[in-house]
From Swiss-Prot:
Gene3D superfamilies linked to this entry: 3.40.50.2300, LytTr DNA-binding domain (2.40.50.1020)
Lineage, highest ranks first: Bacteria, Pseudomonadati, Pseudomonadota, Gammaproteobacteria, Enterobacterales
Designated name of the protein: Transcriptional regulatory protein BtsR
Key words of the record: DNA-binding, Phosphoprotein, Transcription, Transcription regulation, Two-component regulatory system
NCBIfam families, A to Z: PRK11697.1 (NF008677)
Length: 239
């Protein structure tokens, strides 16, 4: 089965696409969203294979949503748009495909056929992974999306419910990015299997008898350090 998530702020547009997709035996619609906050949360929770994403939405566009998703776990993106084919060329590098509104059944069939072919090759995504260093981390919290500058990030932690970013002020937000992505694309250092820390916020390292340690940050918060990563942290501060 191909798991599909529909994101469009227009209820009628979502309904029309839903009706077309429900006629496909191998398609499972796992959810529908009307805005960016709902969409990012649903992608993390539902892990769809394909995201049918409207480009023009209030406040945060479909293009911006794509940039907030973790490249390592990003689904196939099929943009939905009322733009003509000349404008669409600007979007092709970001998407697996696009569909013009109103969506034609024959055109949708072509998209689904291509998706089936790609899945049979076990390709995870057609989107190129951007390996440039991140200047900020996209976070969600309290029904909003905000960009936390790297200088303001104190540490990042991974839990059963996802990955969370803690700011220098102690405020916490959820991010779609994985620890692995953040470790490779930010200055954050691994100090524990479930933690990354911004060494610029470090005040002291408190050593323990069992060979482990604890980081004390300038905001008073503490971060655990496992024996495996203690040596690299000491080297990072010149010890």
């Amino acid at each position: 089965m191909i798991k599909v998530l529909i994101v469009d702020d227009e209820p009628l547009a979502r309904e029309n696409l839903r009706i077309l997709l429900q006629g496909q035996d191998d398609i499972e619609i796992v959810g529908e969203c009307a805005n960016a906050v709902e969409a990012i949360g649903a992608v993390h929770k539902l892990r769809p294979d394909v995201l049918f994403l409207d480009i023009q939405m209030p406040r945060i566009s479909g293009l911006e949503i794509v940039g907030m998703l973790d490249p390592e776990h990003r689904p196939y993106i099929v943009f939905l748009t009322a733009f003509d084919e000349y404008a669409i060329k600007a979007f092709e590098e970001h998407a697996f495909d696009y569909l013009l509104k109103p969506i034609e059944e024959k055109r949708l069939e072509k998209t689904l056929h291509r998706l089936r072919q790609e899945r049979s090759k076990q390709d995870v995504s057609l989107l190129p992974e951007n390996q440039q260093a991140l200047k900020f981390i996209p976070c969600t919290g309290h029904s909003r999306i905000y960009l936390l500058q790297m200088d303001d990030v104190a540490f990042v932690s991974s839990r059963m419910s996802g990955v969370y970013v803690t700011s220098s002020e102690g405020k916490e937000g959820f991010t779609e990015l994985t620890l692995r992505t953040l470790e490779s694309r930010t200055p954050l250092l691994r100090c524990h299997r479930q933690f990354l820390v911004n060494m610029a916020h470090l005040q002291e390292i408190r050593l323990e008898d069992n060979g482990q340690a604890e980081l004390i940050l300038r905001n008073g918060l503490t971060v655990p350090v496992s024996r495996r990563y203690l040596k690299s942290l000491k080297e990072a501060i010149g010890l």
